[in-house]
């Protein structure tokens, strides 16, 4: 994996159609960052949240997580 690339983090579900959260260089932190974001905002959805990490160079989805 290339750690020098920039990755964007998006949260989606029926409430957040596509909420841009921010950019990180290391994609492994995406799930932890998403959990922290939701806790801080007190937006804990009743159902699962899909987290997408997107490579900003190619706009391809690098990884996805389900947060319940």
What is the role of each PLM region?
Residues 1-20:
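Short aromatic-glycine-(Arg/Gly/Cys) micro-motifs in beta-strand/loop hairpins
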Residues 4, 20, 31-32, 53-54, ...:
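A broad "ordered helical/assembly scaffold" signature
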Residues 7-10, 37, 65:
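Aromatic side chains
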Residues 13-16, 24-50:
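A short, charged, amphipathic alpha-helix used as a generic interaction element across diverse proteins
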Residues 16-22, 59-64:
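Surface-exposed loop/edge segments in extracytoplasmic proteins
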Residues 39-68:
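Short, mixed-charge low-complexity intrinsically disordered segments
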